[in-house]
Amino acid sequence: MEPPNLYPVKLYVYDLSKGLARRLSPIMLGKQLEGIWHTSIVVHKDEFFFGSGGISSCPPGGTLLGPPDSVVDVGSTEVTEEIFLEYLSSLGESLFRGEAYNLFEHNCNTFSNEVAQFLTGRKIPSYITDLPSEVLSTPFGQALRPLLDSIQIQPPGGSSVGRPNGQS
């Protein structure tokens, strides 16, 4: 029997604050944050992410965010591209529809964590998934929550998952 093909799985991590969180969080929140994290999963030569427009894909580093600030090796998977795209399609029709997006409770990091576990059985780093509760645990975070709840984030540069890399 042939050994299964293994495909690398990477977590792309972007600091949406471009360093401002590191400098301003002690003053505004009373605690140090290293960044405001956006994440995506790179597998099968594409980058997949979730925002207010639903699940999208692009070539790795192909959003207007540019190259990631860091790359985490999540592991490898035996899941083929065909099965993975079917899985994403089902997620896009259920858990990860665009209207389900919520900056604090159901965001790009929730998606990356779900997909990483499906592909590799591993979670993404807790410093990323714990960020919303860290912010909301501060008086400033609670005061800003109504405003922040109305924010919808969709990194430009991707296409809907039904059309990887913008192909129809």
Swiss-Prot record:
Task: Return the protein name.
Answer: Desumoylating isopeptidase 1
Explain what switches its activity on or off, per the activity regulation comment: Palmostatin B inhibits its palmitoyl protein thioesterase activity.
What Pfam families does this protein map onto?
A: Peptidase_C97
Record key words, sorted: Cytoplasm, Hydrolase, Nucleus, Protease
Question: Which species is the source of this protein?
Answer: Homo sapiens (Human)
> Per the UniProt entry, what is one GO biological process?
proteolysis
GO CC terms in record:
cytosol; nucleus; protein-containing complex
Q: Where in the cell is it found?
A: Cytoplasm; Nucleus
For whether the record's keyword set contains Hydrolase, the answer is: yes
